[in-house]
Amino acid sequence: MNSQQQKQPCTPPPQPQQQQVKQPCQPPPQEPCIPKTKEPCHPKVPEPCHPKVPEPCQPKVPEPCQPKVPEPCPSTVTPAPAQQKTKQK
């Protein structure tokens, strides 16, 4: 009877110990995975975003907007007040 009792409590303890050793081994592989996703994400986002957005946006907006608004605006506003001032004097 003594020999059987000793074998029973001896077999269950080693099982839970092995499981605990595997748990701490899983977190280490996750660490090197975090920097790998950030590296290819940073250079890939600003590269295609910066040159593709400002290039077609800057020349298309100021070109047709600036010459069409200031040209007819100052030519009709400047001569009107200039003539009135000279007539009053």
Swiss-Prot record:
Superkingdom: Eukaryota
Intracellular or extracellular location(s): Cytoplasm
Keywords: Cytoplasm, Keratinization, Repeat
GO biological process: epidermis development; keratinization; keratinocyte differentiation; peptide cross-linking
Region Disordered, residue ranges: 1-29, 68-89
GO cellular component terms attached to this protein's record: cornified envelope; cytosol
Region of interest (6 X 8 AA approximate tandem repeats), residue spans: 31-78
Chain spans, region 2 X 12 AA approximate repeats: 3-29
Family in the record: Belongs to the cornifin (SPRR) family.
Protein name according to UniProt: Cornifin-A
Native source organism of the sequence: Homo sapiens
